[in-house]
Amino acid sequence: MLILTRKVGESINIGDEITVTILGVQGLQVRLGINAPKNVSVHREEIYKRIQAELAPNQDPQ
């Protein structure tokens, strides 16, 4: 895992098309802004896990 330190207003680029910007920090909470192409799904982890759990019973075993 790559660990980076950023200040409010600074960004991290992922590849050529994704930018994550630190918008604010309050206590233990960090606000992120994410710019990504429309074909790239961006979800909070708990939402992503819920989506995967809902899809799992519908997938055919291979």
Curated annotation (Swiss-Prot):
It is found in: Cytoplasm. It holds the Pfam family CsrA. Keywords: Activator, Cytoplasm, Repressor, RNA-binding, Translation regulation. SUPFAM superfamilies: CsrA-like. InterPro entries: CsrA (IPR003751), CsrA_sf (IPR036107). One of its GO terms (molecular function) is mRNA 5'-UTR binding. Homodimer; the beta-strands of each monomer intercalate to form a hydrophobic core, while the alpha-helices form wings that extend away from the core. Belongs to the CsrA/RsmA family. This is Translational regulator CsrA 3. It comes from Pseudomonas syringae pv. tomato (strain ATCC BAA-871 / DC3000). The gene is csrA3.
